[in-house]
């Protein structure tokens, strides 16, 4: 049982017959990032499946200053340790508590990719310069050093900064070429 706001440290991999992660998800149509250490089979709110209420997209690649995502065709395509973006398909106000359910091998660390996630809070100095997704889902902008918001919470994903000069932002291309 994993809960938002708490780090997850797993020194060795293991197999879980049932795993859950609970957090408040936006229901205003805004995009957010997520990474989980298990394969997801359902999203529930108040005990009712709401997986059909969400669009979930997986990272495809980065080309120049464009980050490309492809929509999952089925929630069971959601794989452990891979970072995703998701949004509720309505324009209501606020949040709803969501429980992500699944099972499988729980790895010690998330998959390492340009778009990656973390199971522990990444603090200001280490987060600075990495890129966070805006709520509109249109771009990744750099986290500024020495600001309270320059953190990456556990179970969130980010675009890693490069070693050389980095662009001011990356645009997002959603499934089928639609730009957020």
What are these regions (language model features)?
Residues 1-50, 71-139, 144-180:
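A short, polar beta-strand/turn micro-motif
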Residues 63-71:
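Short linear interaction motifs
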